[in-house]
A protein has these predicted regions:
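Catalytic cores of large soluble enzymes that bind and process phosphate-bearing ligands
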Residues: 48-55, 198, 230, 234, ...
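Small-residue-rich
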Residues: 1-87
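Compositionally biased, low-complexity/repeat regions
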Residues: 5-9, 259-307
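Residue-level marker of positions within ordered structural domains that often coincide
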Residues: 38, 247, 290
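C-terminal hydrophobic structural anchor segments
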Residues: 231-267
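Generic structural hydrophobic/aromatic packing signal, biased to beta-strands
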Residues: 1, 33, 77, 102, ...
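Long, internal scaffold/assembly segments composed of regular secondary structure
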Residues: 84-145
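Long, contiguous, structured domain-core segments that constitute the functional module of a protein
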Residues: 119-237, 241, 284-307
Length: 307
């Protein structure tokens, strides 16, 4: 088990944290890690939340980047937004933590924690490209949600402000019963390619497929030209193999946006690289994500025929 006295910052420390041991023990199987603490633990609030949340952000980002670069096992973190005080929250929308999200709100009033299990369950039920706030997903499986002492529906301006500051938060829609996540923001600038959990999960899945596909080619013999470059047939074969793997696993499953050719990715190997000299093959892989209707503006008026 995990020592309940440990802070989230300590748990996520890349050198000594228990999370690192968990990642290694699972041999790359983990796609996302949700970190929460016992509600009985003491909270020391600053900038609207337990200070531990903000110090854990950098640690979680470092851990996720280490897992990606060293283990070829990309993943994301969701941190529990503990100890919400109702005062001005720190703005996460200017940060750089594009592998970490912070969840606010709980199923109990004035709770020190957040409904991490609700978010984890919703994510587990969705394909990687799907936004957790998609209305067609249906309402969350909870009858009440609170932010601090108030129900979510009692202060829509506060909910909007929390969302704008880069937190994951639930909301209500007029005319619909139940609660929905407002969006899937991660703790970084909105212009980051991976500012949203859906894009993060898509690119991470493509990464894993490419890694697994290319691993079969490790230390394989390569037909080369007299200048040490790869022969055209070899390059074409490698590119097609990677594209086929991703298109079969993701594009065909509706997880990538297909182009006119029916493909959702493209792979390119520079034919000028001298593989004999470097023993390295460099490749560029691009995948096509979906767009999301975060705002829908309607110009509405009467249709009148003038006689």
């Amino acid at each position: 088990g995990v020592d309940k006295a440990k802070t989230m910052t300590e748990l996520c420390d890349r050198q000594t944290g228990a999370v690192k041991k968990l990642i290694v023990s699972q041999n790359g199987a983990l796609r996302g890690i949700f970190v929460a603490r016992d509600n009985a633990t003491k909270v020391s609030a600053t900038d609207g939340l337990d200070a531990d949340v903000f110090t854990a952000l950098a640690k979680a980002q470092q851990m996720a980047e280490w897992s990606t670069t060293d283990l070829y096992a990309p993943l994301f973190f969701i941190l529990e937004g503990r100890g919400y005080t109702g005062t001005t929250l720190k703005d996460l929308s200017n940060e750089t933590y594009n592998r970490v999200g912070v969840l606010l709100g709980d199923t109990e009033a004035d709770s020190q924690g957040a409904c991490v299990g609700t978010l984890a369950g919703r994510l587990a039920s969705l394909p990687v490209q799907r936004n957790i706030g998609r209305v067609k997903n249906g309402a969350l499986k909870t009858t009440l949600l609170y932010v601090g002492k108030k129900k979510v529906e009692e202060d829509s301006e506060v909910i909007s402000s929390i969302h704008d500051k880069g937190y994951i938060i639930a909301r209500k829609y007029v005319g619909r019963s139940g609660y929905f996540f407002a969006d899937d923001r991660l703790a970084c600038v909105e212009t980051d390619d991976y500012a949203h959990l859906s894009n993060r999960r898509v690119i991470d899945k493509a990464y894993r497929i490419a890694y697994n596909t290319l691993l079969d080619m490790m230390l394989d013999e390569l037909e080369i030209n007299s200048d040490g470059t790869m022969q055209t047939g070899v390059i074409t074969s490698w590119q097609q193999t990677v594209e086929n793997a991703i298109n079969r696993s993701m594009t065909a499953a509706g997880e990538l946006s297909a182009g006119n050719n029916g493909e959702g990715c493209s792979c390119y190997i520079d034919p000028k690289q001298n593989v004999v000299a470097t023993s390295k093959v460099e490749m560029t892989l691009k995948v096509r994500p979906f767009g999301y209707a975060r705002y829908v503006d309607v110009n509405l008026g009467f249709q009148v025929t003038t006689v």
